[in-house]
Amino acid sequence: DIKVTNPEGFKKYQEAVPATIAKHGGKYLVRGGDVEPKEGDWAPTRMVVLEFPNMATLKKWYNSDDYQKIIADRTDNSKGNMVFVEGY
């Protein structure tokens, strides 16, 4: 769940992050698109869902130098929530 507060500043993150995800074996399942809340009080405006081979790989990506050097481009230009979920 992410709300972009500064599209111009966020663009740098959008351009850089896909390569970091791919480098660590991840892929986008959802990136933007229409959001239609059905139940509860949560009203996200933009969703991004990534898939990685396993939780260890996801954490390796998140903590990688590649990702950490661009994370401020996301946090300084958006508000959001992020969760890691292990599943199948």
Locate the predicted segments by residue.
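Short S/T/G/P-rich N-terminal loop/turn motif that feeds into the first structured element of a domain
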Residues: 1-46, 51-63, 86-88
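C-terminal structural segments of small proteins and small subunits
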Residues: 55-83
